[in-house]
Structure formats: C-alpha cells, structure tokens
C-alpha cells in the first residue's frame, strides 16, 4: 500500500472502485511538471511550527511545507534531468487590481506581499522555465497557461 492510501477508508475505496476509479491512469506522451504555489507566502521564510508561521504569513503551512520541499526538489531535479518542462505558478500582486484578490484580504502590493510570491531557494525556477503569474487561486483563470500547454503540445501535468 502506498503511504497516502492509509488515509482512504475501506468504504471510500469501494466507492471509487464501483464508480470506475481503479487502477492507474495512463500518462500522456508529452508531460510537464506544474509546481503550484510553492511560494514564501505558503512556506514562510524558514521552518517553524504553523502557529508561529502564520504570524509571519497568515497563509503559511509552517513546518509541513518545509518537510515537503526536499521531495519537491527531488521531483524537480528528476524532471529537469529527463528534460520534462517545468512550470511554476505564483500569485501576482499587481494583477489583483484588474482581477480582484483570491481572498477577502484586499491589500496593496507591498514589499511584504512581493516577498510572499517568491519561490524558496531550493526549488527556484531556472531562467528558461515558465512562470504562471495569477490573480486568483486558479493557475488557469486569466493566465497564459493554456496557451503555453497547447504551444508546447503538453498533454499531461
């Protein structure tokens, strides 16, 4: 059993199986890695318990984000080594004026907010990697992501 499967009840497994969600999905032939919102606003600036981390950024996940970073970094390096395109998403405080904020915390784009949308050093994008800058929670709404995927013929993320 894979580690995450321990969190799925037997009843849920039966539901998934009966509904036809069993086995592995096949990947496409031209995949890309999409790293969604792994930014300072969700990781914080350093490892710390979540109750302390939210004093720095109310959206921070605290220590669990820092625990995930080495795993994300490992996947990132594997994709780069295999020449799989890497795409990042981040919020863009400057877009909020046009599209509105993703939450009810309307704040002007301050230096603090600009720090929040930066990527942690250990998974920082290379210069040739695509960054989706967004005003809303979705990496697709009001962004160029679909255009990028179609132009690059990417068929799975």
Regions found by a protein language model. Give the residues of each.
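Active-site acidic carboxylates
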Residues: 1-126
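Internal catalytic-core helix/loop-beta-alpha segment
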Residues: 113-156
């Amino acid at each position: 059993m894979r580690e995450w499967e321990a969190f799925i009840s037997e009843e849920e497994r039966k539901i998934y199986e009966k509904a036809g969600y069993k086995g592995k999905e096949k990947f496409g032939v031209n995949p890309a890695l999409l790293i969604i919102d792994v930014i300072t606003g969700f990781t914080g600036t350093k490892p710390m318990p979540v109750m302390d981390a939210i004093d720095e950024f109310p959206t921070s996940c605290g220590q669990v984000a820092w625990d995930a970073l080495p795993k994300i970094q490992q996947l990132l390096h594997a994709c780069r080594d295999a020449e799989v395109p890497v795409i990042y998403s981040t919020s863009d405080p400057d877009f909020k004026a046009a599209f509105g904020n993703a939450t009810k915390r309307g704040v002007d784009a301050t230096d603090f907010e600009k720090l929040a949308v930066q990527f942690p050093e250990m998974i920082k994008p290379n210069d040739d990697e695509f960054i989706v800058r967004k005003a809303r929670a979705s990496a697709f709404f009001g962004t160029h992501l679909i255009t990028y995927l179609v132009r690059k013929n990417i068929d799975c993320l």
